[in-house]
From Swiss-Prot:
GO cellular component: cytoplasmic vesicle; extracellular region; microneme
Gene3D superfamilies named in the record: 3.30.30.180, Hepatocyte Growth Factor
Listed Pfam families: PAN_1, PAN_4
InterPro entries referenced in this protein's UniProt entry, alphabetically: Apple, Pan_app
Maturation propeptide residues: 35-103
Keyword presence, Ligase: no
Official protein name in the record: Major microneme antigen
Originating species: Sarcocystis muris
Cystine residue pairs: 112-181, 137-159, 141-147, 185-189, 210-230, 214-220
Length: 241
C-alpha cells in the first residue's frame, strides 16, 4: 500500500517561487537565453551561486559577439556605399607616381585644354615618342617624374614630353596639355610677399598650366593664377592666406 507524500507548505511555496523565477527570466531576456539556462541560473534548487555567475557571463559574452559582428557588417557596408564611382587610383602627381583623373570608362581626363587650336610649346623636350592618342601622350608624361606638360600633334602622332614651364606658340595640328587636368586652382588661393621666381602670361589657358610651370621650375613650391597671370614662388616667399 502506497502512502501519499505530504510536503510542508513552505516547501510548496518555495517550488512555486522557483518556477515563477524561471518564467520571468525567460520572458525578460527573450530568445537570447534558453529556458535551460534560465533554470540553471535560477537553480537555487540545483546549482551553486558560482555556477549561476558563470552562466550569466557566458550569456553576456555571446551577446557581445553578436553586437560586434553586427557593427562590423555595418562598417563594411558604409565603406562600400562611400567608395567613389567616377574616379579611381588617386594620383600622386608631384612625385610622378600614379595616373591623372580617370573617367568611369577608364580614359584619362583631357578636357582642360583645347584640342583644335594648334597650340604648341617651345619648352625643351625630354623625349619624343610615337603614340596613337592624346590620352596616351598624357600617360607618357605621367610615367616620367620630371615631365610637367606635353605637346601632341594629331597629324604626326608624335608626343613631345616637356620638363619646364610651358611656352606657347602656334603650330598646325598641335595640342598642348598639362601633366594632369586635376589642378583647377581658383583665383586668390594664396597670398605672397617678395619677388616671384617667374611670371608667365597664360591668358585663355587652364590654371593647370600654371601648376605645370611650377613643377618645371626649380625651387617652386607655390603659384598664383590671377587674370591669366601665373606667378611662381619659393617656400621663403609665400604664406598661407
Amino acid at each position: 500500500m502506497t502512502l501519499p507524500i505530504h510536503f510542508p507548505r513552505c516547501v510548496l511555496y518555495g517550488m512555486a517561487s522557483a518556477v515563477w523565477s524561471i518564467l520571468f527570466l525567460h520572458i525578460l531576456v527573450g530568445d537570447t537565453m534558453s529556458a535551460a539556462d534560465a533554470l540553471s541560473w535560477s537553480g537555487g534548487l540545483i546549482h551553486s551561486p558560482a555556477h549561476r555567475v558563470n552562466v550569466m557571463r557566458s550569456h553576456h559574452h555571446e551577446m557581445g559577439k553578436e553586437l560586434e559582428q553586427q557593427h562590423g557588417g555595418e562598417e563594411q557596408q558604409m565603406q562600400r556605399d562611400t567608395k567613389p564611382a567616377a574616379f579611381s587610383n588617386p594620383p600622386h602627381l608631384a612625385t610622378g607616381r600614379g595616373p591623372s583623373f580617370v573617367h568611369a570608362d577608364g580614359q584619362l581626363d583631357v578636357s582642360c585644354f583645347p584640342h583644335d587650336k594648334n597650340i604648341g610649346s617651345r619648352t625643351t623636350e625630354v623625349a619624343v615618342v610615337q603614340v596613337s592618342s592624346v590620352q596616351d601622350c598624357m600617360k607618357q608624361c605621367q610615367s616620367r617624374p620630371t615631365c610637367s606638360h606635353f605637346t601632341y600633334n594629331k597629324n604626326s602622332k608624335k608626343c613631345h614630353l616637356k620638363d619646364g614651364a610651358p611656352v606657347f606658340y602656334t603650330y598646325t595640328g598641335d595640342m598642348t596639355g598639362p601633366r594632369s587636368c586635376e589642378h583647377t586652382c581658383t583665383d586668390n588661393c594664396w597670398m605672397h610677399s617678395g619677388n616671384p621666381l617667374g611670371t608667365f602670361q597664360y591668358s585663355g589657358h587652364a590654371p593647370a598650366f600654371c601648376w605645370a610651370a611650377c613643377k618645371g621650375t626649380a625651387g617652386c613650391v607655390m603659384y598664383t593664377f590671377q587674370g591669366g597671370v601665373c606667378k611662381l614662388y619659393s617656400k621663403n616667399s609665400v604664406e598661407r592666406a
